[in-house]
Amino acid sequence: MEIISIPLKGSLVHQDNLGHKKVVSEGEIQVMSTGKGVFHSEYNNSPSETAEFLQIWVFPNQLNVTPRYDQIPLDQSAEHNTLQQVIGPFPGPKAVHDGKPHKENGTWIYQDAYFHLGTFDAGREIQYDLKKQGNGIYLFVIDGAFLLDGHRLEKRDGLGIVDTETINLKAAEQGSRILIIEVPMKNNLQ
């Protein structure tokens, strides 16, 4: 399984049997490939403050790989009025160079999947073109609201879309933030 954690508020402690004990905070993204197997836990780093986060599990396209952990900072200024790719497929172009994630592509997972984050001014129009034919899209509104084909998506709304090549969104409020996940719709185990 490919497990992606995105803190929205506060921070989490990640601990696993591979020796990782890390704090992942708002403004960072954590990726773990469970591969051949790993025991792990995530919990709130603060005894008194609330933590909010997304944890997304994606079926991998390869089995029995060596488990791995990666954590990168997000350049939130780079996602202003544009979609910033934060996750792409392995061994995607420039996905890793000298063991470090390539700034433009974020980090990677064992799947033909793409994760994009963006924060938009009110009225800003966004076009997302699918990277791979046959993939589907899941939209998740983190903050604010977006319009899609006359439908309003509010904070914490999600929507799955299939059989399309392009989607067009419009930010309905100032500071509207969205996560766009593009994943295969069919089993693609190698």
Model-derived features with residue positions:
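Jelly-roll (double-stranded beta-helix
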Residues: M1-Q190
